[in-house]
């Protein structure tokens, strides 16, 4: 027989079990009394009742244990909640106070703004009144100072004008002659511009007359002194050529060694530059020349091997790793010893020699 209570283990369930157990005990006592009165009842019924009572007691014990455990857990949870509440109570209070203050600020924002604006207006009005009072108090002083500065400025301007006028008069007295001369020059330039053609014609006519007279005089002088002038010119030319020859010989004698050294130096420099260029060309073309020579040598060896193969004297057991130069040389020597040819082919011998001897061109 199961427990007639719910699985929740609530306090109401424990009370119901206790009441059922009490009713069961009362019924059992009544039945026991009835059995004793009736002369002994059914024993099996009593056993069932006892089993039901035990099951009810077990259920009650479990419910009580659950109730005790729940009470302990509830007490521990209450302690933890109290500790958390004690720890976070200031923060919660501060946050709630902040929210209240924000709400108050939001509610009174317009009033605060209006109050600030009104205070600023009042302050500006008071400041304006103070400034007006200061202006009213200092206005005569300010007017007097302004008039004084104006008079000083006018006096300074008048003084500067007087000084400038005196300087201009001094400059005028100093440069009056220059100005008059310049004006006269301008007038003369204007007159020259008007009479320029006449002046040019007169100047040209005078120049022509002078040239004609000079030409006549020079012709007369030339006719008179022409033999002497020719003789003197020839004499001067001879003397100049002799002196020039002596100077050139002396210069050649002095600079001959330097010229020879310069020539030798230029030759050496040219050789050095040529050697550098040749070395640069060798360094640039050496790999290509070596590659071309190796290709030509390989081609020559191939042709020699083909020719020997055609003659049937080529070792057919040679492999790609075999020394092809030695094979070709041995085949040529065998042919020469056998007397099949008068002498080894110059082409094959030359090819073998070229391949066997490293190329000395360009230092390869």
UniProtKB/Swiss-Prot annotation:
Alphabetically ordered keywords of this record: Coiled coil, Secreted, Signal
Keyword flag Chaperone: no
Coiled coil region boundaries: 142-196, 288-313
GO cellular component term, pick one: symbiont-containing vacuole
GO terms assigned for molecular function: actin filament binding
Domain of life, per lineage: Bacteria
A single GO BP: biological process involved in interaction with host
Keyword Transcription regulation listed: no
Subcellular location: Secreted
Function (record text): Associates with actin filament appendages that are formed in the inclusion appendages of the parasitophorous vacuole during infection of the host erythrocyte.
Record's protein name: Appendage-associated protein
Source lineage: Bacteria, Pseudomonadati, Pseudomonadota, Alphaproteobacteria, Rickettsiales
Gene of this entry: aaaP
């Amino acid at each position: 027989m199961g427990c007639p209570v719910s699985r929740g283990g609530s306090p109401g369930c424990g009370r119901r079990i206790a009441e059922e157990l009490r009713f069961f005990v009362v019924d059992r006592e009544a039945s026991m009394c009835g059995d004793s009165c009736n002369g002994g009842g059914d024993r099996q019924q009593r056993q069932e009742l006892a089993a039901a009572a035990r099951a009810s007691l077990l259920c009650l014990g479990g419910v009580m244990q659950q109730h005790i455990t729940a009470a302990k857990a509830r007490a521990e949870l209450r302690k933890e909640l109290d500790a958390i509440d004690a720890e976070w109570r200031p923060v919660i209070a501060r946050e709630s106070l902040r929210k209240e203050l924000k709400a108050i600020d939001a509610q009174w924002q317009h009033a605060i703004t209006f109050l600030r604006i009104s205070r600023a207006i009042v302050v500006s009005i008071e400041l304006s009144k103070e400034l007006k009072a200061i202006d009213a108090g200092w206005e005569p002083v300010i007017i007097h100072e302004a008039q004084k500065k104006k008079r000083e400025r006018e006096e300074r301007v008048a003084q500067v004008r007087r000084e400038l006028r005196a300087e201009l008069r001094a400059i005028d007295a100093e440069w009056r002659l220059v100005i008059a001369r310049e004006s006269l020059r301008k007038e003369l330039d204007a007159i020259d511009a008007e009479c320029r053609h006449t002046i040019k014609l007169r100047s040209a006519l005078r120049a022509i007359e002078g040239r004609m007279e000079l030409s006549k005089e020079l012709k007369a002088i030339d006719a008179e002194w022409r033999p002497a002038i020719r003789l003197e010119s020839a004499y001067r030319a001879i003397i100049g050529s002799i002196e020039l020859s002596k100077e050139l010989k002396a210069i050649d004698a002095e600079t001959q060694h330097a010229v020879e050294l310069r020539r030798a130096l230029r030759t050496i420099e040219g050789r050095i530059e040529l050697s550098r260029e040749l070395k640069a060309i060798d360094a640039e073309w050496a790999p290509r020349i070596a590659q071309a020579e190796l290709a030509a040598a390989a081609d020559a060896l191939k042709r020699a091997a083909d020719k020997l193969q055609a003659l049937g004297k080529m070792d057919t057991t040679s492999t790609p790793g075999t020394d092809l130069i030695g094979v070709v040389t041995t085949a040529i020597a065998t042919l020469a010893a056998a007397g099949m040819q008068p002498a080894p082919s110059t082409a094959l011998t030359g090819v073998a020699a070229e391949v066997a001897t490293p190329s000395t061109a360009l230092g390869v």
